[in-house]
UniProtKB/Swiss-Prot annotation:
It comes from Dictyostelium discoideum (Social amoeba). It comes from the Eukaryota. Residues 1-26 are annotated as: Disordered. Residues 1-25 have a biased composition (Low complexity). This is UPF0512 protein E.
Length: 91
């Protein structure tokens, strides 16, 4: 399976996501195989809400969040909450 290392960099708190590309490496086999994943946030803050399809070796995977309302919105909120807790240490 491919490990998409830049999922966290795609997440943002404005929910204004465009289509962006991220490249991943698959190691541990006879050769390194690069694949491209397309993440489309759709409308609202859908993020990676819908996994449209993932092809096999050396292929492209299309990810379309549509208007489903998103799985990584929770990750965004968690990041914001952790950031606030770190900055509110006082006295």
């Amino acid at each position: 399976m491919a490990i998409f290392k830049s999922i966290s960099s795609i997440s943002n708190s404005t929910s204004a996501m465009g289509s962006s590309n991220s490249t991943s490496n698959r190691n541990g086999f006879t050769s390194n195989d690069n694949s491209i994943a397309y993440f489309d946030g759709g409308c609202g803050g859908s993020g990676l809400g819908g996994w449209g399809g993932l092809s096999g070796w050396g292929g492209d995977g299309g990810f379309n969040g549509g208007c489903s309302g998103g799985s990584n919105t929770n990750i965004i909120n968690l990041d914001i909450d952790i950031g606030r807790r770190r900055h509110r240490r006082c006295c």
